[in-house]
Regions:
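Homeobox/homeodomain signature
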Residues: 66, 252, 347, 357-359, ...
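Extended, folded cores of ATP/NTP-driven motor/assembly subunits in large transport
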Residues: 1-343
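Glycine-rich phosphate-binding loop of nucleotide-binding enzymes
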Residues: 1, 5-13, 352-395
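Pre-P-loop entry segment of helicase/translocase ATPase cores
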Residues: 331-363
Length: 395
């Protein structure tokens, strides 16, 4: 766990002030029938249909314990400013290679998305109720349409201050106020584990190291100046000059600790915007979903605050295009930013001729695997004596 955290810190430190990074976590609902189809065992003309029925019912009960009805996807989008498209492409290609190599060090499999895949992902965000995505780039020239025409929902409505409507869905965008002195690494995973369609986006922008150190030094100078003024006031009033406001003493020590982190502990300063999008069929269901997410934030001494009259900007900032339209940012060091570790649970749910191996201990989702698809299909059964290893192998 410590190694993952340290590697994730190094991953974030790679991005300099010229690169904007967006981490997107999208939980989208699928048709429940698709998951049930994966565990369905059809009847055959023999004497074992009763056993098949019993096993199929057991699999459906196990399926109901988890949230296999949700497809969880993670995306990273990085954006730069350049003088020309050619210069941007060459630099983005170098950044992409470095990002993929850094992911390999983390043990994370990642790949670049094609234009079609990006459009399909955007279509899924704008059509949360589902729907088939039909598109081909060869259709654009004859039809005179643009790619936006193929991904846009039937309607948008942003007239209400605290809600927005998109097609048949009603949604709300909130931002996380990070108030806690110490953050728990489970806050992001707990929000993503909600059995609702939720979209979480982290906009991360690095501050130039020299500029960050200069800014903190200026703050320390300002605090020292205020401290001197308080001491002068104490001398004039005739009481001990060491008695200064507690907030001033606290801010001074925290600023000096922050400066030490930046100068000697391989830390950088980042500006973070944490956005949460909830969507539901009814306003009551939406409020319940937002309340559940706000409860997780409150448990971690943070606050989930609605973006009043900024719903459109919030939704557009929650689309993985690398643009942040919400000017609400929180300054954090590398280690504080890295506490939002997105790699918590590894899921395995294959369809086809997959076998059932049990439930994921963290998420309660089913583990279905078809080992015949792997380069090395061998398996290893571990367990305490008498736990049923031989029986499991014979079964």
């Amino acid at each position: 766990k410590t190694a993952i955290f340290e590697n994730w810190c190094d991953f974030l430190n790679y991005f300099d002030a010229s690169v904007s990074v967006q981490l997107s976590f999208i939980n989208q609902g699928t048709q429940r029938g698709e998951a049930e189809k994966a565990v369905n065992i059809p009847a055959q003309e023999d004497a074992f249909n009763s056993i098949r029925t019993e096993y199929r019912d057991m699999l459906k009960n196990q399926l109901a314990k988890g949230n296999n009805g949700l497809v969880k996807a993670k995306y990273i989008t990085f954006a730069i400013e350049a003088d020309s498209l050619g210069a941007a492409k060459s630099r983005l290609a170098r950044i992409e290679t470095d990002v993929l190599n850094n992911f390999k060090l983390l043990g994370v499999s990642a790949r670049p998305m094609t234009g079609y895949e990006r459009l399909k992902m955007l279509h899924g965000i704008f059509h949360p109720e589902g729907g088939q995505f039909a598109f081909d780039f060869s259709w654009l020239a004859p039809s005179g349409l643009s790619t936006k025409d193929f991904i846009a929902p039937s309607s948008f409505r942003f007239g209400e201050g605290r809600y927005f409507r998109m097609g048949r869905k009603i949604g709300a965008v909130s931002f996380l106020e990070i108030l806690a002195p110490e953050l728990n690494d489970r806050i992001l995973s707990d929000i993503l584990d909600l059995e609702t369609g939720v979209i979480v986006n982290l906009h991360i922008h690095s501050i130039d190291q020299t500029e960050a150190i200069k800014t903190i030094k200026r703050k320390i100078t300002d605090l020292d100046k205020m401290k001197i003024e308080e001491q002068k006031k104490a001398v004039r009033s005739g009481y001990d000059m060491d008695i200064i406001p507690s907030d001033l003493a606290t801010f001074g020590s925290e600023a000096k600790n922050l400066l030490q982190d930046l100068q000697s502990r391989n830390e950088r300063m980042f500006l973070l915007t944490f956005l949460v999008v909830n969507m539901a069929d009814t306003k009551r269901k939406l409020e319940n979903d937002v309340f559940a997410a706000a409860g997780i934030a409150q448990k971690n001494n943070c606050a989930l605050t609605r973006l009043d009259y900024q719903q459109e900007a919030g939704l557009m900032s929650s689309v993985p295009l690398g643009e942040n339209l919400i000017p609400i940012q929180r300054g954090l060091t590398t280690s504080s930013t890295a506490i939002f570790i997105p790699f918590i649970t590894q899921e395995l749910f294959q369809t086809g001729a997959a076998l059932y191996y049990g439930l994921n201990a963290l998420s309660n989702n089913m583990i279905l695997c078809d080992r015949k698809q792997l380069k090395n299909p061998n398996g290893l059964i571990l367990g305490t004596p008498g736990s049923g290893k031989s029986f499991a192998a014979k079964r």
